[in-house]
């Protein structure tokens, strides 16, 4: 099973991702965090395979949390999740050490696909971001 941590500052988003991803028997949601500080601590104690990381959280952003997690390990796969499609956000997260980027316009099916690909060691960009990068 792939151990997943969900990190988002919006309760409804956390609950929706949890509900959706819990239906896939390959995934196990091991923690749900509401800010960057919580996800950093959860990564230290729970050793997830994948973190789904909202980039806009307070007081510690998803970008900063990604950077801190990367200072401790390269073993955890991190997929950024955001409403932002601007390349500076994508670049900042990827430079911090993320393995992928998915916008909140993406489907649950696409998120599961992203998880599977980053677990294979590949980078993943949702179609919306891939189209922007290629244009």
Regions picked out by a protein language model, each given a short descriptive name:
Residues 8, 54, 82:
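Active-site residues of response regulator receiver
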Residues 13, 53, 58:
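The feature encodes the CheY-like receiver
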Residues 41, 63-74:
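Short amphipathic alpha-helix used as the core "switch/output" element in two-component signaling
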Residues 46-52:
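Active-site beta3 strand of CheY-like receiver
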Residues 88-95, 100-135:
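Short, flexible helix-to-coil linker/hinge segments that flank and couple to helix-turn-helix
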């Amino acid at each position: 099973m792939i151990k997943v941590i969900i990190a988002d500052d919006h309760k409804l988003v956390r609950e929706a991702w949890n509900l959706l991803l819990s239906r896939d028997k390959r995934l196990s949601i091991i923690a749900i965090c509401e800010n960057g500080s919580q996800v950093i601590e959860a990564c230290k104690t729970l050793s997830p395979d994948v973190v789904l990381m909202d980039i806009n959280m307070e007081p510690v952003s998803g970008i900063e949390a990604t950077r801190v997690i990367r200072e401790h390990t390269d073993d955890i796969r991190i997929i950024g999740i955001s409403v932002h499609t601007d390349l500076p956000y994508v670049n900042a997260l990827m430079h911090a050490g993320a393995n992928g980027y998915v916008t909140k316009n993406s489907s649950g099916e696409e998120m599961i696909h992203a998880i599977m690909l980053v677990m294979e060691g590949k980078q993943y960009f949702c179609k919306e971001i891939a189209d922007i990068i290629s244009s």
